[in-house]
From Swiss-Prot:
<feature type="compositionally biased region" description="Gly residues">
    <location>
        <begin position="1"/>
        <end position="17"/>
    </location>
</feature>
<dbReference type="GO" id="GO:0031047">
    <property type="term" value="P:regulatory ncRNA-mediated gene silencing"/>
</dbReference>
<dbReference type="InterPro" id="IPR003165">
    <property type="entry name" value="Piwi"/>
</dbReference>
<dbReference type="InterPro" id="IPR012337">
    <property type="entry name" value="RNaseH-like_sf"/>
</dbReference>
<feature type="region of interest" description="Disordered">
    <location>
        <begin position="850"/>
        <end position="876"/>
    </location>
</feature>
<dbReference type="GO" id="GO:0005634">
    <property type="term" value="C:nucleus"/>
</dbReference>
<dbReference type="InterPro" id="IPR032472">
    <property type="entry name" value="ArgoL2"/>
</dbReference>
<feature type="region of interest" description="Disordered">
    <location>
        <begin position="1"/>
        <end position="68"/>
    </location>
</feature>
<dbReference type="GO" id="GO:0003723">
    <property type="term" value="F:RNA binding"/>
</dbReference>
<protein>
    <recommendedName>
        <fullName>Protein argonaute 11</fullName>
    </recommendedName>
</protein>
<dbReference type="Pfam" id="PF02170">
    <property type="entry name" value="PAZ"/>
</dbReference>
<dbReference type="InterPro" id="IPR045246">
    <property type="entry name" value="Piwi_ago-like"/>
</dbReference>
<comment type="function">
    <text>Probably involved in the RNA silencing pathway. May bind to short RNAs such as microRNAs (miRNAs) or short interfering RNAs (siRNAs), and represses the translation of mRNAs which are complementary to them.</text>
</comment>
<dbReference type="Pfam" id="PF02171">
    <property type="entry name" value="Piwi"/>
</dbReference>
<comment type="similarity">
    <text>Belongs to the argonaute family. Ago subfamily.</text>
</comment>
<dbReference type="InterPro" id="IPR036085">
    <property type="entry name" value="PAZ_dom_sf"/>
</dbReference>
<feature type="region of interest" description="Disordered">
    <location>
        <begin position="86"/>
        <end position="117"/>
    </location>
</feature>
Length: 892
């Protein structure tokens, strides 16, 4: 079997040069032709273009489509798999020894002949690793992973069926444990199988049968009123021969296994094994309800108005009160007979319980949104320095004592009790360019931080018409005027241009007049501009001072009203957050001089995408999708957004590409990708992007293939709909923050290995040992810690047609983290993804006036369209954002 090639779209060879078609002639001989085994889709059009969007020889670099490969025969069945890659053009070399480009090199995207995309996410093969990074200062860090030693043993897999079937894993395990005890002579008593509580069992060596049925009797639970025994039939069947060898697994983890993508078994995905064999420990904190009597809870938190204990109901045809019922049934005299009862049943069959007989049991997680005070307390309690966290993890690992687990001994698995020592590198920080009129024109950040002293914005925005409105009764109007003057002074001092006086007088209004006051000040400003003879202009910025109490509710109402109805950008925060006026704080020095490989050589568009979901407990609210994209090339610091609503908890972005028929029955193309590419073209002299880099947040590992298949298809269709043959090469990167990997300095006393918070240095990147041995992923800690333990971000490249080397992509991603508009610090995730999350959170406010802020992540096109969720209920579309607002980073 040949090595893996160029990811989903594939190309001949990929970075390593080997053909990426799996199976080759072997597949043609062993099974039916793979091209017959899959129903092909209509291929996307290919063609040529010109200008900066074109390839090196003047033709547009076409996107290689997704190609089916030959069928593999596994366990006697023919399984159709799609592999990355495709047959090379006629006359092309079948192998190449060219190495991956270094940071300063650019390798042109490979060509491909039209191919067919796969129709199943199971067919997708992820991008192969192009090599390991070398840029930066070498160092070592400790990861909260524990090295696992494997013995050379054969592992056998058995299918288990229990009848009658049970849902409880614990009950299933009890049945298997009883089977092992009572049928020891049939099971080879030396074996200690590992059972997953469902249908899978593994043994270190073969059992003395391939298929056998057993009868197991289990005593019923007397505490539940069940006496006697219950009989179960257990069938154990060999799922295959010795289908997993420890030495093969070790080869895979070392990156030397002949087929890097998976072992030859249809159910065992190697990803599961990597998680199991790269054991990690971490500490998580969450909130729980306090275990206490319900009466105490009601006194502390609730103002309940429910049924009291004197309420009557029918018992055997007799009307009795709750007090009488408990006295007769349980000989229990209620003490608090005037307290209300709890309704513990359903609406159709209510069950009323007195509060005093109920307790809130321990261990119930509180899943709703915490208020600001609770969040502060939670962070304070959960905060641990890196050294404290490392010690806590080691303490837990020693308590668990994995090395002495009987299953570990049975399978020859040894687990170290020390954190894994991992090779890492600290990438150099980028040089930041400021305006030449400032004393400091170029800034070299120190440990991920810098300030605005003696610097001016490179391209500060201008505001000619602004106003201010306050709803904070505790702040005097004179104080608000002083604040506005200081705001104008500070903004002008750092390179912005703001007129000194508002276009209408500063006003103080009552909170219950919010909508009317905002509409009125918008009307007054329009009248002022008309009187001044200003044509085509309107209020550019409305500064709003909010009260401390209920500020969140007011914030949502203001944003919905101003951004979707009035078309006014508002600033409800302090001067340090005034970013929404169309300028740029800073850009990368190398971007201006076009020294960033695979970014500045041709017009490049960087996308960020996220989907956020409603909070727990809401079963009908739509999810929100958001996509942002860079509009300024080569600086890539200004991002336009598109947002849309979609089905409840649907992770795949639905509106990336749309096609509908108009009244004339003609196809009309739309969607978020097309909208943003058209905006890019207008902002860059009619040039289309010749390269796309797509950072996607919120995707779990189990969704990689499905999201990639669907969203890459949408990106290609959107590009092809703009111009025939327009298919720029795409790099698709998943950004993961919700994982449990933590990195610690090797020596907690070496100051040169840490930042001020005693965390690892910003720019620390790891792409070995704790990463996938053959797929393209890396951990990057791009920020300087403030408190607690820093959380590195996991970047996983699912698809790369731009031939990024490890160094090139890692450096680009790290440098982008210095361009976040809200602060003079590098941030922990790449800014396009950060912006997408902010845009999605903002769009959540648009769903309902006065709604509370978002609890998850969101995405894109304001039109949204009318669709139905999985329950057949129409998804409520988002109101459209006014076009003059969308031109700015209003969400930031």
């Amino acid at each position: 079997m040949s090595s893996r090639g160029g990811g989903v779209g594939g190309r001949r060879g990929g970075p390593g040069g080997a053909s990426s078609v799996r199976g080759g002639e072997r597949g043609r001989k062993r099974g039916r032709g793979a091209l017959d085994a899959v129903e092909p889709r209509v291929p996307l059009p290919r063609g040529t273009g010109s200008g900066p969007g074109a390839g090196r020889d003047g033709a547009a670099a076409p996107v290689p489509a997704l190609q089916p490969a030959e069928a593999d025969v596994l366990s006697g069945e023919v399984e159709t798999e799609m592999a990355a890659g495709m047959e090379a053009r006629e006359g092309a070399s079948s192998s190449s020894s060219a190495s991956a480009p270094a940071v300063g090199e650019v390798e042109p995207p490979s060509r491909a002949v039209g191919a067919l995309p796969p129709t199943s996410s199971k067919a997708v093969v992820l991008q192969a690793r192009p090599g390991f990074g070398t840029v930066g200062t070498s160092c070592r860090v400790r990861a909260n992973h524990f090295v696992v030693q494997l013995a050379d043993k054969e592992i056998y897999h058995y299918d288990v069926a229990i009848a009658p079937e049970l849902r409880s894993r614990e009950r299933n395990r009890n049945i298997i444990n009883e089977l092992l005890r009572s049928h020891k002579k049939y099971l080879d008593g030396r074996r200690s199988p590992a059972y997953d509580g469902r249908k899978g069992m593994f043994t270190a060596g073969a059992l003395p049968f391939t298929d056998r049925e057993f009868v197991v009797k289990i005593a019923n639970d007397p505490e539940r009123g069940n006496q006697g025994e219950k009989e179960f039939k257990v069938t154990i069947k060999c799922a295959g021969a010795a289908n997993l060898y420890m030495h093969s697994l070790k080869q895979f983890l070392a990156g030397t296994y002949p087929s890097q993508d998976r072992f030859s078994h249809k159910h065992l995905d190697i990803r599961i094994l990597i998680v199991a064999l790269n054991g990690g420990e971490d500490i998580s904190a969450t909130t729980f309800y306090k275990a206490q009597p319900v009466i105490d809870f009601a006194l502390d938190y609730l103002n309940m108005n429910i049924r009291d204990a004197y309420s009557r109901f029918d018992q055997d045809g007799t009307r009795v009160s709750v007090v009488q019922y408990f006295n007769r049934q349980y000989s229990y005299s209620l003490k608090y007979i005037n307290w209300p009862c709890l309704q513990a049943g359903s609406d159709s069959r209510p069950t009323y319980l007195p509060m005093e007989v109920c307790r809130i049991v321990k261990g119930q997680r509180y899943s709703r949104k915490l208020n600001e005070c609770q969040v502060t307390r939670m962070l304070r309690l959960a905060r641990e320095t890196p050294e404290e966290r490392e010690n806590s993890i080691l303490e837990i690992a020693n308590e668990n004592n994995y090395g002495n687990d009987y299953h570990a001994r049975e399978f020859g698995i040894g687990v170290t009790n020390q954190l894994a020592l991992v090779d890492a590198r600290v990438l150099p920080a980028p040089m930041l360019k400021y305006h030449d009129s400032g004393q400091e024109k170029v800034c070299n950040p120190s440990i991920g931080q810098w300030n605005m002293n003696n610097k001016r914005m490179l391209n500060g925005g201008s505001i000619n018409y602004w106003a201010c409105l306050t709803f904070a009764s505790c702040v005097r109007l004179a104080e608000v005027r002083t604040f506005c003057k200081e705001l104008v002074r500070v903004c002008n001092s750092i390179g912005m241009q703001i007129t000194g006086e508002p276009c209408v007088r500063i006003r103080q209004e009552r909170q219950d007049h919010l909508d009317a006051a905002v509409r009125d000040i918008h009307r007054q400003s329009a009248e002022f501009l008309s009187q001044q003879g200003v044509i085509g202009q309107q209020l550019e910025l409305l500064v709003i001072v909010l009260p401390d109490a209920n500020a969140t509710v007011f914030y949502g109402r203001i944003k919905r009203l101003c951004e979707t109805e009035l078309g006014v950008i508002t600033q409800c925060c302090l001067a340090r957050n005034v970013q929404n006026v169309g300028g740029r704080n800073t850009v990368l020095e190398d971007a201006l001089h076009r020294r960033i490989p695979l970014l500045t050589d041709m017009p490049t568009m960087i996308f960020g995408a996220d989907v956020t979901h409603p909070p727990a407990g809401e079963d009908s609210s739509p999810s929100i999708a958001a996509v942002v994209a860079s509009m300024d090339w080569p600086e890539v610091s200004k991002y336009k957004c598109s947002v849309s609503s979609q089905s409840h908890r649907e992770e795949i972005i639905a509106d990336l590409f749309t096609e509908v028929k108009d009244s004339q029955n003609r196809l009309v193309y739309g969607g978020m990708i097309r909208e943003l590419i058209e905006s890019f073209r207008k902002a860059n002299g009619s040039y289309k992007p010749g390269r796309i880099i797509f950072y996607r947040d919120g995707v779990s590992e189990g969704q990689f293939s499905q999201v990639l298949l669907s969203e890459m298809d949408a990106i290609r269709k959107a590009c092809a709909s703009i111009e025939e043959g327009y298919l720029p090469p795409v790099t698709f990167v998943v950004v993961q923050k919700r994982h449990h990997t933590r990195l610690f300095p090797e020596d907690h006393h070496a100051r040169d290995q840490m930042d001020r918070s005693r965390n690892i240095l910003p720019g620390t990147v790891v792409d070995t040992k704790i990463c996938h041995p053959s797929e393209f992923d890396f951990y990057l800690c791009s920020h300087s810690g403030i408190q607690g333990t820093s959380h590195p971000t996991h970047y996983y490249v699912l698809f790369d047609e731009n031939n990024f080397s490890a160094d090139a992509l890692q450096t680009l991603t790290y440098h982008l983290c210095y361009t976040y508009a809200r602060c003079t610090r590098s941030v922990s995730i790449v800014p396009p993804v950060y912006y997408a999350h902010l845009a999605a959170s903002r769009a959540r406010h648009y769903l309902e006036e006065g709604s509370l802020p978002d609890h998850g992540s969101s995405s894109a096109s304001a039109a949204g369209g009318s669709r139905r969720n999985d329950r057949g209920v129409p998804v409520k579309p988002l109101p459209e954002i006014k076009e003059n607002v969308k031109q700015f980073m209003f969400y930031c």
